[in-house]
Amino acid sequence: ITASKVLEIALTGRDCGQEERAPMCGVPYHAVDGYISKLIENGYKAAICEQLEDPALAKGIVKRDVIRVITPGTIIDQAMLDEKTNNYLCCIYLDKGFGMSYVDISTGELHVTENISLNDFLKNSTNDLLIEEINKIAPSEIISNKLTGNEPVDSMINLSEGLSLDECKEIVLKHFKLVSLDSLGLKDNFHAVTSLGMLLNYLNETQKTSLDHINKLHFYKVGEYLQLDGSTRKNLELIETIRGKKGPGTLYHVIDNTMTAMGGRLLKKWIEEPLKNIKHINLRLDAVEELYKNVMASNNIKECLRSVYDIERLISRIVYGSCNGRDMNSLKQSLSNLPDLKAELSGLSSELFAEIYSKFDELKDIFDIIDKAIVEEPPVSIKEGGILKTGYDDELDELKEITVNGKNWISGLQTKERDATGIKNLKIGFNKVFGYYLEVTKSYLKDVPEYYIRKQTLANCERYVTPELKEMEAKILNADEQIMKLEYELFLEIRQFISSQVKSIQETAYNIAVVDTINSLAIAAVKNNYVRPEMNSKGYMSITDGRHPVIEKIMKNEMFVPNDTYIDNREYRMSIITGPNMAGKSTYMRQVALIALL
């Protein structure tokens, strides 16, 4: 009833005995993704139920079960996701502080943090930190053992019974195949472990499949990055404008020259989590400067990345078991660019690029198996054959030869029967209900030989079979059935092989994202005539001819007037800015903040 209203489809019903009628509604299977997306957008969950056994082999009613529950935070279908935005599922554990874990199951990215309040005086500030962390990651779904007291956040929370610490430890260790929490860096972080255990338990209950792509945990401390509260992020218009729109008018739009979805997501993360460590800042700046000065290398890298698909989300679909041959070819196409990209990296000398080059895996074995196995234009379905190339498997080739020879024989039978019967318009056809048949129009029925067996009568023709046609049909259909079964089994083997390499693929995908993001910043610097800052820890900031990076791009017919800034932590701790309304006071302040972030 609810689905029919939300999806705007007809509500029907079926008698189910005792004068009751079961309400029903349905959608075409091939178009189900669009309807599921609409349900999720309206705040509902969708349970996917499938047959668990072959109907031909089942005894009695075919066994069915829920194989997955799709929720706002567990979407993996790329059509339902923004390619350059993470889709986080967040889990919070509240008890004298908080533990927070969040995951993007479409990429395998997993983060964990915690903050403990030792007394009531710190309780409010701890809660504020939690709300700021939640606002920063902007999750699609939140699970928590308690409400936070913040109305916008609480409206998103699904309350869940908290698990015990021991239960959560067991879940975490089982997932990561470990015997101790030490190697995860969570030895004494009980709030973090509890939130992580609750998160993984929720995923196990809803996804009911392998989560092997979620294999790397990033534990961080709140405050490890520069803290930007919600008001600051909103007013600086980092990712969205004040009106909540993406695109022009944001810092992200000005500096986003990424060529891949992975790079686009990482750039957003870097903007929202500014570094505080000068060494790490200079490491990035060294790499940006190298590409800024080497425009040819920058352009070559850009071209290498142009046809790279979203490897992070592709490998997640493969591990999930929801990929098809087209996903495999998208991965192959992406990997085909890696040798050229690695060659470009070999000519770069900055420490960050040297480190990436030293561990850059071209994943040649994965490229080779896909290239050898998958046809150039595979079908969407993986259970109906037509996926694998000739030459990949000997047994499969033999079966294909049977069908080819059989179909050639059937084509020859048409000519043979026309000559034998004199029926000039006799033709051979096929459908899934009646199989192969000989079709004769009404005007030639008098010429039909006795050995023809009537199969079907239509308005203008009769359809027949012959013993030899039935025999060949059985051979072809049997071979076709075996081909579909064998191709499916071989495809699963290929999928399993690629899934076993998930860590290497994810590491390469991350390295590609870093290169893409660094190159994006270098391109932005060239386009906008930015200069490299000199970082110091002496407590002062000096800006000469500073410009607001966003407003100068919006101004079409006017030139932004650059201005200077100097502040320190001694004599010039404060500047008083005066002027009439709309004179640019807030623009100047935001300009300084954005330059500091850049």
Predicted regions and their residues:
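Charged catalytic and DNA/RNA-contacting regions of genome-maintenance
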Residues: 1-290, 299, 303-319, 323-415
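ATPase nucleotide-binding head domains, primarily ABC-like/P-loop NTPase cores
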Residues: 6, 189, 259-260, 264, ...
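Short beta-strand motif preference
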Residues: 98-102, 438, 543
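Charged, surface-exposed helical/loop "interaction arms" that form contiguous linear patches used
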Residues: 320, 334-337, 390-391, 417-425, ...
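Extended, charged helical/alpha-beta scaffold domains that provide interaction surfaces
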Residues: 411, 418-442, 449
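Extended, charged coiled-coil "arm/hinge" scaffolds of SMC/Rad50-like chromosome-maintenance ATPases
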Residues: 458, 462-496
